């Protein structure tokens, strides 16, 4: 699915600004790009590590006094149970696509979608993109799993929503409305999907 890495780094940037202002260590991250846990900083070889590898960075982050960890969780990891037994403070469902349909990942879109929905079985707060395909079903599943629900998208009924987007020479400018902050934001990365990723990062940060 597209957007996990971008959203993870948006969240990390937001959290690090706050953590720095509080005099605290920067947050840890496990992503498809690189990993940092307060002890090890390295390029990633897999989006979500195997279960026996996964707990070492958690321990390293804890021992380093790190209070927050941002993590990409792949649909394949959810399918095979790499994060089974974990509880995430916040999880976000960005979108559903065909990019992971293959003989070694998901045989079809239904399997991919069902795997992704397992995220909400492990979340205290679930954030859902209402502009994505199957949004109503995703929202219903998050609610049925007992998650506190935060929605984000282009609808005024969303918890975090974007009123308008303007493309300028130096990036995309958009107005955001939410319970905790309202105002104009901008990103330099092109593509409307990155506005959606930014909204996801705001929703996640708002829940923390």
Say what each PLM segment does.
Residues 4, 134-135, 158, 194:
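Alpha-helix N-cap/loop-to-helix initiation residues
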Residues 2-126, 130, 136-145, 206:
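Phosphate-binding loop of NTP-binding sites
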Residues 105-113, 124-125, 140-208:
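Adenine nucleotide phosphate-binding catalytic loops in nucleotide-utilizing enzymes
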Residues 131-132, 178:
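Heptad-repeat coiled-coil segments of the DHp/HisKA dimerization-phosphoacceptor module
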């Amino acid at each position: 699915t597209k957007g996990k890495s971008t959203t993870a780094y948006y969240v990390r940037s937001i959290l690090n600004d706050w953590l720095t202002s509080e005099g605290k260590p920067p947050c840890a991250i496990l992503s498809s790009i690189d990993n940092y846990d307060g002890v090890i900083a390295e390029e990633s070889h897999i989006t979500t590590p195997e279960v026996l590898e996964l707990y070492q960075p958690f321990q390293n982050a804890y021992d380093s006094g790190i209070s927050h960890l941002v993590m990409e969780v792949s649909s394949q990891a959810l399918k095979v149970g790499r994060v089974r037994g974990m509880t995430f403070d916040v999880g976000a469902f960005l979108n559903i696509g065909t990019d992971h349909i293959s003989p070694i990942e998901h045989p079809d879109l239904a399997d991919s979608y069902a795997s992704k929905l397992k995220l909400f079985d492990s979340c205290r707060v679930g954030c859902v993109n209402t502009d994505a395909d199957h949004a109503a079903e995703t929202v219903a599943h998050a609610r049925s799993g007992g998650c506190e629900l935060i929605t984000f998208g282009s609808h005024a009924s969303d918890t975090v929503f974007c009123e308008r987007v303007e493309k300028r020479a130096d990036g995309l400018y958009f107005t955001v409305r939410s319970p905790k902050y309202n105002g104009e934001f901008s990103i330099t990365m092109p593509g409307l999907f990155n506005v959606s990723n930014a909204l996801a990062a705001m929703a996640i940060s708002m829940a923390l």
